[in-house]
Amino acid sequence: MHIEQITPELTWRLRRDVLYPNQKIFEMEMDEDAGGIHFGAFKDDKLAGVVSLFQKETDFQFRKLAVDPSVQKMGIGNSLLNYITDYARENNATRIWCNARFTAIGFYLKAGFIQTGNLFSKNGYDYEIMEKFVWTADLADFLISLNR
């Protein structure tokens, strides 16, 4: 399996198939797509997972994480999360966050995200904002030194 940057259009089919199966492919395009960075996980040269990442200063929001059901539970979602977390960290992020569907909260908790208590519903789905603070090695070393 490998992960690489892809065009927004390549995310749409998996977004639809996994997250919104009753919608049309063209409905998967987000206005924000042009301003985001999109990543695909490929297994056996087939697109198996996608995620879109959006930066606002030192905050990075990821959206529409989707893994093909035929390869779920194989670590692809975790690999995508680790990849975008590293990407965000390398680009001076302090926080990475998402609007997590209630059905995915356990997945994000296992990946080190925390629940914020900010809940909302949209398009028939219930969400909670979840976040993870990421630090560069220099900042982490500095914070550790404060506790010595």
Indicate residue ranges for each PLM-predicted region.
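Conserved GNAT acetyl-CoA-binding A-motif
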Residues: 88-101
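Conserved catalytic-core motifs of GNAT/GCN5-like acyltransferases
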Residues: 99, 114-132
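Short amphipathic alpha-helix that is part of the acyltransferase structural core
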Residues: 1-43, 134, 141-148
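Conserved acetyl-CoA-binding loop-helix of GNAT-fold acetyltransferases
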Residues: 67, 73-86
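A conserved beta-turn-beta hairpin within the catalytic core of GNAT-like acetyltransferases
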Residues: 55-65, 72, 122-127
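Conserved beta-strand in the GNAT
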Residues: 40, 46-54, 61-66
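Conserved active-site tyrosine of GNAT-family acetyltransferases
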Residues: 15, 108, 113
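Conserved short alpha-helix immediately C-terminal to the canonical SAM/SAH-binding motif I
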Residues: 80, 104-107
